[in-house]
Amino acid sequence: MDVLTKVPVREQDAKERATNFKEVCLGYNEEEAVAEASRCINCKNAQCVKGCPVAIDIPAFIHEVKEGNIEKAYQIISESSALPAVCGRVCPQESQCEGKCIRGIKGDPISIGKLERFVADWARENGIKPNGATEKKGKKVAVIGSGPAGLTCAGDLAKAGYDVTIFEALHEAGGVLVYGIPEFRLPKEAVVAKEIENVKSLGVKIETNVVIGKSVTIDELMEKEGFSAVFIGSGAGLPKFMGIPGENSNGVFSANEYLTRSNLMKAFNPASPTPIMRGKKVAVVGGGNVAMDAARTALRLGAEVHIVYRRSEEELPARVEEVHHAKEEGIIFDLLTNPTEIIADEKGWVTGMKCIKMELGEPDESGRRRPVEVPGSEFVMELDTVIMSLGTSPNPLISSTTEGLETNKWKCIIADEENGKTTKEGVYAGGDAVTGAATVILAMGAGKAAAKGIDEYLSK
């Protein structure tokens, strides 16, 4: 075995998967996982752990995989992570744990994410649950939002002995895991629902269809319902648009709405009561993971799909793996291109999009080179659907109905990065509601930090 080269992971064939919503990556079997784990040199001062936002003891769990002790490996992971089967699939490991791996200096880094996924899937298939609390604290904590931040915070607090209730605005728990990430990347029934069941097995209660700020306020939860502390993990669900002419035309969607229709409402299924527009030629404006998800969803619904992004491929914020999969499946990348107007017919339906070519100038405040228009390079793309994937911001409903809870100019809740503490006594926050749209694992890290902060607050 070549220890410098990682064990390849099996995937659905690109042509076949472009026509279905089944999971693309098939993961490792036990033999492959043990072989990959055997490449790990078990560093004493493991940099991979420092690269993990939830600080999983990576060398320890990989050692147990190498020895064939998969259940023990799972318990090591679940001490730190409430959602290992999710993280193993959607975390940007290449820039976090795997990006710090010593093996990667000369050769391939250890496939930490694929090993985490294998362990979590094995545990699920064998009915193994995470270890729960040994003693109860007798105090109630409310968690707002059942996405990655909320589930992580709730799981950690339940393990610490608190009586935790999650309040979810939608009819189904999971947050962005169920409405934002497609089935072909993250199966809902086989993976997400089972991870949520694991959190519930710790004693966490989940109430759906509860909109905090309408159904009940944070002050009412604390003053009338007996909750000693509240964690806000409500995410960032308000889509951003470009503000160009024609954006209100029929056939223009936010990626948020488009993906929610497909993922949560199962609109890709012809029998679904919630329709989705099956465009023939679709442009997705943006270059992040959400743009890739929307583009690959539209492709599976039968469209010719173009990614329109104003910078070059090097600046694409999406994971390398997602870009690679999109290209394999036949999605066209129109880079250094920026929309200026959406064109519609007399009935208001999209027929095209005016664009201008761009070139890269000096770096901006983000460190990426600023795109500059190329004079005289305007052209029109013929389209029937445009999906805007330009990021999201938090819904101001909670902050506007909670006295003493301060936000910044982007309506993000102001919270201490170390412990999630907000400007309101007993109220903590983390994830996209604080940072704006970011990754699943960063939201989990924030939920974990807030759980520790709440425990310290309630232990005084």
Task: Provide a role label for each language-model segment.
Residues 248-279, 363-437:
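FAD-site-proximal beta/loop scaffold in flavoenzymes
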Residues 140-165, 291-299:
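N-terminal Rossmann-like FAD-binding beta1-loop-alpha1 element of flavoenzymes
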Residues 119-135, 192-214, 239-301, 408-418, ...:
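Glycine-rich dinucleotide-binding loop and its adjacent helix/turn
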